[in-house]
Structure formats: C-alpha cells, structure tokens
From Swiss-Prot:
<feature type="repeat" description="ANK 3">
    <location>
        <begin position="210"/>
        <end position="239"/>
    </location>
</feature>
<keyword id="KW-0040">ANK repeat</keyword>
<comment type="function">
    <text>Required for normal progression through mitosis. Involved in chromosome alignment and cytokinesis via regulation of microtubules polymerization.</text>
</comment>
<dbReference type="GO" id="GO:0005737">
    <property type="term" value="C:cytoplasm"/>
</dbReference>
<keyword id="KW-0597">Phosphoprotein</keyword>
<feature type="region of interest" description="Disordered">
    <location>
        <begin position="1"/>
        <end position="99"/>
    </location>
</feature>
<comment type="subunit">
    <text>Interacts with PSRC1; recruited by PSRC1 to the spindle during mitosis.</text>
</comment>
<keyword id="KW-0677">Repeat</keyword>
<keyword id="KW-0131">Cell cycle</keyword>
<keyword id="KW-0206">Cytoskeleton</keyword>
<keyword id="KW-0498">Mitosis</keyword>
<dbReference type="GO" id="GO:0000922">
    <property type="term" value="C:spindle pole"/>
</dbReference>
<dbReference type="GO" id="GO:0051301">
    <property type="term" value="P:cell division"/>
</dbReference>
<keyword id="KW-0132">Cell division</keyword>
<feature type="region of interest" description="Disordered">
    <location>
        <begin position="383"/>
        <end position="402"/>
    </location>
</feature>
<dbReference type="GO" id="GO:1902412">
    <property type="term" value="P:regulation of mitotic cytokinesis"/>
</dbReference>
<dbReference type="Pfam" id="PF12796">
    <property type="entry name" value="Ank_2"/>
</dbReference>
Length: 530
C-alpha cells in the first residue's frame, strides 16, 4: 500500500490537477450523492492486484473524495442521448436509465483512479466496461493525463498501445501528457515516460494556453536531464511563451545555472548551424541574381539597339526632306515624345542610370554551366630510366629558373565580389531581414533569412569594405580625444598623501618635511572605543 499512501499524500498537498503553469489550487470538496455512496461501497471491496499492494485497501480519503466529485461531474454533462430518452412521467425505464448513468459515472471514476495509482489490471477492467467515448473530468483530464501526471509508465503503455489513446490529447488548458509528466515531483520516473511518449510521436513543441512548451516547464523546474532529452530530440530552444519568455529566461529567473549553461550552448550551436545553412543559400541566391542581372542587361541592350536604329532611321528620313522647316521638326519631335507610352518613358528614364551597358556586361561574371564528367580510360605510365649523365644538354633538360613573385601577405588575396548596387535596392522589412527590389520593378523572393547588415554587406561589397568587418566597431579617432592622465607637479598634495601612506610611523623629521612642503593635511580624528 506504499504507492497508494504516497498518492494520498500527494493528493492532499495540493489540487488533483497540477496545472503546471497556472499553480496548484485548493482541493475540491466531495459531492455526496447516491451513485458516489455506491462507488465507495464498491471501493471497500476492491483489492489491489499489483505486486506492491497485496492487502485489501481502504479508500484514499483525499483522492477518493476528489474523484467522487469528478464522477458526479462526469455523470451530468456527458450523459449519452441513448440513455436519457425524453419522457413526461417517471417510469421504470427512466429509473433503469438513471442506474445506467450512475454505473457509467462509477466506471469513469474508477478508470481515472486506476490510471492515477498505476493499477494496470484494474485499468483494463474499467476500460472494458466503459463506453467507446473517452471520459473526462471538468478540466478535460482523461486517464492518459492522470497516468502521465503521476508517472505511471505501465498505464501509459496500456492506454496508447491497447486502447489507442492519442498521445497528444489536450485538456481544457491545451496540456498534453508530455506537459504533465514534466514536474519536479516526477524526477525519478519522468525520463522513461518522456522517452516513451516521444517514441510514440508526441509533439515536442506543443504549447499550452499560455504558450508554454515542455522545454519551458523543464527549464522552470531545473530538470537538467529532461532538458537534455528534449533538446537532443529537437525541441525549439528559441520558443517563446505568451509573455515572450524563452526557456533560458526561466533558468535565469529561478537560478538554475546548469540548465542555463546547457541551453546557452544549445542556442549558440543552433544559431551557428542556421547561419551556416542560410549562408549556403546566400551563395546560390547570388548566382541566381547574377543570372537575372545578366539577362536584364542583354534585354536592355537589345531594346536600346532597336531604339537607336529607329532614331537613326528617323534622322535619315528627316535629311531626305530638306524643304521642311525647323519648326515642323520641333513639332514632330514633340508629338513623338507625347505619343510614347508610359512604359517607354520609364524604360528611357531607367536607361539613364546605365550609361555603359557593354562595360557592365563585361564586369558581370558569365554564368557557367557545370561541366559534364567525361570518363577517360586510365593509362599506365611506366617510370623512365634515371639519366645518369652529368651533361645538362641531354634530355630531360633541367629547368631550375622560375619567376618568383613578391608577396606582401601570407593569405591569398580575396577575389573581388560582384556588387549589385546598380541592379538591386535593399530595404529593411521591419523584422530584422531585408526586401529586394530590382530596377525593372520586380520583388525578389524568397530572401535568405539573414540579418539586414549581413545581406547589405554581401550584396553591396563596395559600400562595406572587406577589412572593416573585424573587429566590430573599430574606427579612427583623434589623439586629442584620448583620455590622458593628469600631470602631477611638486605642488600637488597627491605626492604627500602617497608618502604618508607608505610610512609606518610619523617621526618629527618626516612631519617637518611635509610641513615645509605644503603643510600638514587635515587628518581624521581617531575613533575612541565606547
């Protein structure tokens, strides 16, 4: 009866439903009813079948009273329609229906009770006698929630594998069994239950009504082993609750230093991994932008060539008629300018920003296709005989001369990166990222999820010099602004104070020297012991 006694103590210490994030409330008072009296009578006859309880058990005072009240609540709102036919007058059939309802409430009461105490045989018996629907109490707790709350792994296995209970079944506060199993009272039994629920597909990042994830609860209670299991299984270390707190914030609030160190290291690794992945995407993104700019400049060059040829033909056509006056040419040019469409005007305006298209095409690296691998039959090369002659004219001729260049550094010079400042306009999106807009009026998406400064430095390398990346915040200052020490001369009292601090005793010669220099300083009066 050890487990039953411990269950009774835990039930008396707080509410039967530990809301995990909302606090433990007061224990509800039992509701006397006829069905509950019958349930208490049956509980007096029930015997434990587990190895830990072989003797007949008395009903647990606090736990039984609470579950009796829950059974009363179960009997009222979840009354099946088939068991309560509408009748105007009392009849024996109505009494039989009420008896069936009472039996259903008793079955639900014992089902939750068996799951909480961990009696597998009793739980199977109650589940076989109950209806097909899953009974719940007034807070939405079912048998799988009670089994998870008290860390009963055997009951969890029976409910999930034999009776197909969902592992992510929600309560009224959107709590899952994985939320309920993580608690400081379940330190010794929480890990096996967590491993089992994760194996069965439990949601790692499920959030309650206040936005708490299982990792938030483990970090708040300082359960380092649970935190490690959740993080290694893929829990989101940057998840925020309704108040914007992360799991590491709860570690700081409750002074769980070990959990805070582990979460800080996990967050750093996650950030670096995400940054490396986005930088890989950025390389592919820049190659796509280069191809887009190359195609745009080719189309622009073709359009510019067509317009230039049309202008030349128009000029030649005007030269073939020397009789018309300059006024007619001016009117014709004005009419031609007015007849242009807005698209042509915009094209002409955008061309003014590109004075040299050919030069830009030469600067853009040509998009190259990946060479196809060509299989070549390996050839076997036999080593040649060593030339034993000391005549340098005989083949193979020895070549020892080589033009040696002068290097000014150890590392190779970085290749110049292409600048997209004349093709792209980078704007902040308000969330730390950037939005890209081309000169031809198109938005580029999707953009790698990188900070705005990183995107600006990658796309505008001329604006952000390469050597100014590290150290951050390095800038030249004037020597006049450098803080300097104050010059201490002979007339400064500081020298006398230093000399007085270095002496153990003040003899007459020393006091005379200090008095002749600037005078004796004001010494603090000695404190007398009361």
């Amino acid at each position: 009866m050890a487990s039953a006694g411990s269950t009774a103590r835990r039930a008396g210490s707080g509410s039967w439903h530990s809301e995990r994030g909302e606090g433990r409330g007061a224990r509800p008072q039992p509701t006397p009813s006829g069905s509950m009296q019958q349930a208490n009578k049956v509980s007096l006859k029930a015997t434990w079948t587990d190895a830990e309880s072989k003797q007949p058990s008395q009903p647990l005072p606090d736990l039984a009273d609470h579950l009796s009240a829950q059974a009363t609540a179960l009997a009222r709102p979840r009354r099946p329609a088939s068991l309560t036919p509408p009748r105007a007058d009392p009849s024996p059939s109505k009494e039989s229906d009420q008896t069936a309802i009472d039996q259903t409430a008793i079955g639900s009461y014992y089902q939750l009770f068996a799951a909480a105490v961990g009696n597998v045989e009793w739980l199977r018996f109650c589940l076989n006698q109950s209806l097909r629907e899953i009974p719940t109490d007034d807070k939405g707790f079912t048998a799988i929630h009670f089994a998870a709350q008290w860390g009963k792994l055997a009951c969890l296995q029976v409910l999930v594998e034999e009776y197909k209970f969902p592992v992510d079944l929600l309560t009224n506060n959107s709590q899952t069994p994985l939320h309920l199993v993580i608690h400081r009272d379940n330190t010794t039994v929480a890990l096996p239950c967590i491993y089992y629920l994760l194996e069965k597909g439990a949601d790692l990042n499920a959030q309650t009504c206040n936005g708490s994830t299982p990792l938030h609860l483990a970090a708040r209670d300082g359960l380092l082993d649970c935190v490690k299991v959740l993080v290694q299984s893929g829990a989101n270390v940057h998840a925020q609750d309704a108040m914007g707190y992360k799991p590491i914030d709860f570690c700081k609030i409750w002074n769980h230093r070990a959990c805070a160190r582990f979460l800080k290291d996990a967050m750093w690794k996650k950030d670096k991994k995400d940054f490396a992945r986005e930088m890989t995407k950025m390389k592919m993104f820049k190659s796509q932008l280069t191809l887009m700019e190359h195609n745009y400049l080719i189309e622009y060059q073709k359009e510019h060539k067509i317009l230039r040829e049309a202008a030349i033909r128009k000029w030649l056509h005007g030269k073939l008629h020397p009789g018309h006056s300059l006024v007619s040419n001016t009117k014709q040019a004005r009419a031609t300018a007015l007849s242009k469409t807005p698209e042509q005007r915009e094209s002409q305006r955008s061309r003014s920003f590109h004075p040299s298209v050919d030069a830009r095409l030469q600067c853009i690296p040509q998009p190259t296709e990946m060479p196809k691998p060509i299989y070549r039959k390996p050839t076997v090369k036999r080593p040649t005989m060593w030339n034993v002659s000391n005549n340098p004219a005989r083949p193979p001729t020895t070549q020892i001369s080589h033009s040696q260049g002068i290097r000014l550094g150890v590392h190779p010079d970085p290749t110049p990166e292409h600048d997209f400042s004349s093709f792209l306009e980078v704007r902040p999106d308000g969330h730390g990222g950037a939005r890209l807009h081309t000169v031809d009026g198109h938005w580029v998406a999707p953009v790698p999820r990188l900070p705005f400064e990183v995107l600006l430095r990658m796309l505008y390398p001329r604006v952000w010099p390469y050597r100014m990346k590290v150290p951050q915040g390095f800038y030249p200052i004037s020597m006049r602004e450098v803080p300097r020490k104050r010059h201490l001369g002979d007339n400064t009292f500081w020298t006398d104070t230093l000399a007085m601090n270095l002496r153990d005793t003040f003899d007459e010669a020393f006091l005379a020297a200090v008095r002749s220099h600037q005078g004796l300083p004001t010494l603090p009066s000695p404190q007398t012991n009361p």
